[in-house]
Regions:
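Residue-level hotspots at or immediately adjacent to binding/recognition sites across diverse folds
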Residues: 23-328
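Bacterial N-terminal signal peptides
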Residues: 10-19
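Bacterial N-terminal signal peptides that target proteins for export
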Residues: 2-11
Length: 328
């Protein structure tokens, strides 16, 4: 039986994953979905945005229905990309420079742009299985990784022309790697990290050739992570849990976030402040390398889904279930 479903890995993820619709089919069915270009429509500015990145001076955000939004004035105004070859939800975006970038989403979609996000081409999709990609990271315009459902990690060494699956370590007592991968990021040394399910961080110190699994010490799923200029690592996620590491991810301590609302995005601003956003309209800010956070909430409790620092100002650009949040 063919059906359209809301993606839900487990009950603890249901709140956040309300924003991640996916088309699926039962095992054994033939693919029932054909790619169609994203519509260009006025309501795109109110679409749920799930990922954002800097592309030089431009900010590019991706989200529901294949919507890609662009801002050339540091988040004051946005417009829709001219051509996107899919209507599936896009979850994350990464740019190697001001022109070349990649976006990933449901149905294993990988999109590629060479004009700063104005137009996109399809590099990969997988209509035969229901394994969405949640995160993407590139170093330069050749080496890249994309991570997603049930431990799916893809690697490219040619800018996404071809992808191969990478085998992650298997958790003791498990038969295969199956933890969902939510956020790829790197530090200034070049180490790679993946914030993942059940309080897990994966680390590679050799450019992604080998990986090790590190338990942060909490059971909560980690949805986002950042490497600060100081070298400190911060990961965060379900029910407001925040973990911090000062030794390259080998050991972690928990930071009191002051909230039970799940954290969906985190970034470091140019002035060194750290800003995290989350469900229920929550924002958290730290000025001491992530040791302490102050918390505030929007009166309307609108879910905040992504945050990126602007290239020229110490003002974050925030996205939500209703599109970009006005910059003050």
């Amino acid at each position: 039986m063919k059906r359209k479903v809301n993606f839900s890995v487990c009950i603890t993820l249901s709140l956040f994953l309300l924003f991640l619709p996916v088309y699926g089919q039962q095992s054994g069915d033939q693919p029932c979905f054909k790619q169609r270009p994203a519509l260009v429509f006025p309501g795109a500015l109110r679409a749920t945005m799930l990922g954002a990145a800097q592309a030089g001076q431009r900010i590019v955000a991706v989200g529901d229905h294949g919507v890609v939004l662009l801002s050339d004035d540091q988040g004051k105004t946005f417009r829709q990309a001219k051509a996107v070859p899919t209507r599936v939800t896009l979850n994350a975006v990464s740019f190697a420079n001001d022109k070349e970038g990649w976006a990933v989403g449901h149905l294993g979609v990988v999109l590629h742009t060479v004009d700063g996000g104005e137009t996109w081409g399809m590099q990969r999709d997988d209509l035969s299985s229901d394994r969405p990609l949640f995160t993407v990271w590139f170093r330069g315009n050749a080496l890249g990784f994309a991570g997603g459902l049930w431990g799916l990690l893809l690697k490219t060494t040619n800018g996404g022309t071809s992808w191969e699956e990478v085998k992650l370590p298997v958790t003791q007592g498990r038969k295969k790697a199956e933890k969902n991968l939510f956020a790829l990021f790197s530090n200034q040394k070049g180490d790679l990290f993946i914030a993942a399910e059940r309080g897990t961080v994966f680390k590679s110190a050799d450019g992604g050739q080998t990986w090790k699994e590190i338990a942060t010490g909490i059971p909560a799923t980690l949805w986002t992570g950042v490497a600060l200029k100081s070298g400190t690592l911060i990961v965060a996620g379900l029910r407001g849990r925040i973990m911090r590491s000062e030794d390259g991810g080998e050991h972690w301590i928990e930071v009191n976030s002051g909230t039970k609302s799940s954290i969906t995005g985190i970034t470091e601003l140019a002035d060194g402040r750290i800003l995290a956003v989350g469900l229920d309209g929550v924002s958290l800010q730290s000025s001491d390398d992530g040791r302490n956070f102050s918390v505030s909430s929007r009166p309307d409790r609108m879910a905040l889904t992504a945050v990126v620092s602007s290239a020229q100002r110490d003002i974050p650009v925030i996205f939500s279930e209703n599109g970009p949040v006005a910059v003050k």
